[in-house]
Amino acid sequence: MVFENDCRMYEKKYPEENELVMVRIESIGDMGVYVSLLEYNNIEGMILLSEISRRRIRSINKLVRVGKTEAVVVVRVDKDKGYIDLSKRRVTPEEYAQCEERFHKSKAVHGIVRYVATKLSTEDNVVKTKHLYTKFVWPLYTKYGHAYEAFKLSITEPSVFNGFDIAENERKVLMETIIQKLKPQPHKVRADLEITCYDYEGIDAIKHAITASQNHALSVLKAPEDGKFDEKAFGVVTIKLVAPPLYVMVGTFDEKEKGLSMVGQCVDVLSEEITKKNGNLTIKAAPRIVGAVDDQELRDLMEQLEVENQDGDGEEHEDDDDDDDDEEEEEKPKEKKSSRK
């Protein structure tokens, strides 16, 4: 079903031959599989039976399912008749991943544009999605390769929209929507480490190595005006003691790969610095993405260790009391013997 406020995601009306597109399976016929091209306002296309799989087809329902989305490649386009022939079997796993990535970005842009059009519309003036696409979205695709990259960049550089015919109220709603929809999601990265140094100044050596490691992460960040970094800010890496010799290295990042790479670098710096002081670093758990469950497990572990430490202190005091009682018991028989004399 095509809604009044719907519009294709790209400027050209039809895809080009050899272009990867994302489709939804609509029905299965005698000649092939009928699909709708999601990026092109759901226009119809067909995957011929011979283009579904490289293998012999025994049951077509096992290869395609109505309602499922698939990445396919355009084989032929007849713009006069509106025919679009597609192939599923010619798409490699790498191309499939590329198509999915582009579609998810395009879908995010489309959702933002539709929402902005709805917010700007009134009873007297309906703003159509295509109107916004024509004014600035399609030109952004041309300039930045993908409008998603331009939208994401505008969060820190609003000047991205300079030069486009965008009214002030349109720009305000657009920026608010982009910030709400595309604001980076935090990814927490953690590594579990054992750090030891038995030299005379071992504690100072560990402190120095930790500081050097944390400063490595800060070196690539833009310092705030007051010069103080919030440990929860993106890119800041902190190292905390759980219980000697166990430490955890934690950082929050806007991109997973960037976070894993930076924490890995900080581990290397820490290892290098502590080795210089005749210390040792053992990686108990390599840098990885962690969530709320992992955080809770860490808190539980720290609480357990704290309780064990307290119990240990209490047992030492009890042992001291027992020793005193034993001494008193040993003294009492001696007093009795002396009284008999």
Swiss-Prot record:
GO biological process: regulation of translation; translational initiation
Places the protein is found: Cytoplasm, Cytosol
Quaternary context: Eukaryotic translation initiation factor 2 eIF2 is a heterotrimeric complex composed of an alpha, a beta and a gamma subunit.
Family label: Belongs to the eIF-2-alpha family.
Compositionally biased residues, Acidic residues: 303-330
Organism classification: Eukaryota, Amoebozoa, Evosea, Eumycetozoa, Dictyostelia
Listed Pfam families: EIF_2_alpha, S1
Protein name: Eukaryotic translation initiation factor 2 subunit 1
Main location: cytoplasm
GO MF annotations in UniProt: ribosome binding; RNA binding; translation initiation factor activity
Cited SUPFAM superfamilies: eIF-2-alpha, C-terminal domain (SSF110993), eIF2alpha middle domain-like (SSF116742), Nucleic acid-binding proteins (SSF50249)
Organism: Dictyostelium discoideum
Keyword line: Cytoplasm, Initiation factor, Protein biosynthesis, RNA-binding, Translation regulation
Chain positions covered by the region annotation Disordered: 301-341
Basic and acidic residues bias (residue ranges): 331-341
Role this protein plays: eIF-2 functions in the early steps of protein synthesis by forming a ternary complex with GTP and initiator tRNA. This complex binds to a 40S ribosomal subunit, followed by mRNA binding to form a 43S pre-initiation complex. Junction of the 60S ribosomal subunit to form the 80S initiation complex is preceded by hydrolysis of the GTP bound to eIF-2 and release of an eIF-2-GDP binary complex. In order for eIF-2 to recycle and catalyze another round of initiation, the GDP bound to eIF-2 must exchange with GTP by way of a reaction catalyzed by eIF2B.
Database matches in PROSITE patterns: S1
GO CC terms in record: cytosol; eukaryotic 48S preinitiation complex; eukaryotic translation initiation factor 2 complex
S1 motif domain: residues covered: 18-89
Superkingdom assignment: Eukaryota
